[in-house]
Amino acid sequence: MFKIIEDKPPQWLLDNIASSTDKLKSNYTLERLKLEQMICFCLLYEDDKIVGFSGLQKFEGNTARVNSRCYITPEYRQYKIRNERVRYPWKYLAPYQIKVAEKLGYTKLFWSTELYKRPEKTMNLTIKYATQYIPEGWQYKRLGHKDINGVKQEVCEILKS
């Protein structure tokens, strides 16, 4: 059974990430997680095992970033389980964070990802998957490439309709 708990990640998990070969491991320290900028920071569990984490980050104006500093543990990174690919951030964390933002009066959110080998294809596949789980009254809208804190990223708006 999956559940979300709002808390900071346990230090043992951050230590495991720091000693791993994860190419983004420098983002996953208490300092670099930017917890002070998070409206909420969510840990996703399956029973008593941590699946991953991400935050809903305050941004410019009345905007917030969904799935900021998202990390999924290696045990849960996969392509298919029982013939279905599970994208934990989009099935569990994003819907939770969108609902938190809605309760606080947000009507415009976004998420972004660094540009990888197949940027548009990856973004489109993620939107298609995430749309299955988006809370009622919200929609995803792909924006293309934007500068986010000095890094060129692919961006998707999440808008209250």
For the regions a language model picked out, list residue spans one by one.
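Short amphipathic alpha-helix that is part of the acyltransferase structural core
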Residues: 1-30
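Short glycine-aromatic motifs
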Residues: 2, 38-39, 127-133, 138-140
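Short, high-confidence coil segments that cap the C-terminus of an alpha-helix
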Residues: 38-39, 103-106
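Conserved acetyl-CoA-binding loop-helix of GNAT-fold acetyltransferases
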Residues: 72, 78-101
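Alpha-helical elements of Rossmann-like donor-binding domains used by nucleotide-donor carbohydrate transfer enzymes
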Residues: 12-19, 92, 96, 125
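Conserved beta-strand-loop-alpha-helix junction that forms the acyl-donor binding cleft
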Residues: 109-134
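C-terminal "cap" of GNAT-fold acetyltransferases
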Residues: 132-161
